[in-house]
């Protein structure tokens, strides 16, 4: 069965035409013509963004993009891919190594400095460091946050050949230290770290991606100059010293006596490239990794604190992604002309297609991250011996934050960049094989409204879990006893200002916020430091947008996302997208269950709205809000806001 980019059935001949158009676009990509400016200069692109039928290029090359919906199967949505056949369960799931600190004297290059090191490196002819702003106070000021940090790392962004499947050739990826995902940073609250991030990426991108980068610590309470602002990119041959304070929010403002609010503790973060205009390509090419924070309660040791399963043996980070591969060569491909959203027909866990994980019959903490680029997930545990049976488990976090208490769930829904920590007791599956299955049928990159949840065993099996390892002592607390974690910080105070944001698309196909495009140089509004604001987010079209705000977390006041339902493909029936969502003409609902939490990304499904409240404490500088369907982000669904001593009251920026 074949579909076009609108989810409509088409003939095999029509699908082949779409595929050939994609191949034409790839020829342009390989020739280095990856920007609209290049194509307009050559007369191949109109000002409205349409490809012109010229030199054999199909007029459908733009309209029927690879991220459309041309599925050749009836499973959980394969996009417009035609990747080579790969055998599942041929490789063990990689667990990225934990990054080890080094001595300050072991850093390559000059010693770290508070101000950017703009001295010219004679070997490259450009500045040693790509940073353009100084580390802000209190870093290095009166010793409050020591500089350089006592814990220092050096990581190299470099090209490497990586195996994703024995049935595909080695893939030439952008990596951190030769790995994708990159190494895992295991950090602790109260211990600042400095990471010297070296850019050693080559000029030859192999068809897509760019070798100037900006690394963002997603969900970090990070000073602006180290946040990975999309326009703070640095070139190949330079380094960038990023300082992560690892301090609780409020440590300089609302909770100085306790060195921050313990209820603002973070746990599961991740890092990824954030280069303006190229985030999707560089992330797709491999620039992602895990960052984990522990404290005196979430300790990484199941005999202390909250007694969650011990890291790293029983606490395992997992990154989910989907990718397309060339049907002939087996090489990773990316459609740079796609502005809607790219879906792959191969599902990866920690960089490998459909791997295997062997576990012991005991409780594990699994940290799930959806890295996209555009696919929404709804993950179930499936036993193929009884695929329709419910296999509930416990969700203990939403994004990077522990819930007040564990919540038993049948599944977890994840938009791009959303995270969930879950606890699964594998003792109930001793000697068995089970699977993590994505049952959300997403036929195209827009993320809805034609998606629905398929039955057990009819979706896409992403990970095979074999419970065959020796029995191990389990000192972790049973989540069924509903232990308490953190208390939600109060957001009952009146906001200093309420701002409204509409996420939409202009007539040229560019994604917008309040009808405006992203600018590196212009802040749309200024937030007053240490204030509370309410932001009302709305999505009036048939698209889904996972909206991420940098710098601090929010709480969803109204319009919280629920699990996707199993409704039919009636596009007027939006109930499938979760009973907690508000649609046009309905009254919004308050958050409950797993959404009664702190978050940094909120899913706006078609015609939905959500109201969030958040504080902006401790740091100043420039930050962004954007759609984390990174295709939308790269095509301007992003805005810059600044945090300063004095803020404005612009309600519709």
Where are the predicted features?
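N-terminal secretory signal peptides
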Residues: 1-38, 60-62
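A long-range scaffold signal marking pre-active-site subdomains of enzyme folds
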Residues: 56, 62-227, 231-237, 241-268, ...
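Short, cationic motifs built from Arg/Lys/His that form the positively charged side of catalytic pockets
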Residues: 36-37, 367-370, 499
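Extracytoplasmic beta-sandwich strand-turn segments characteristic of Greek-key/jelly-roll folds
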Residues: 180, 185, 213, 217-264, ...
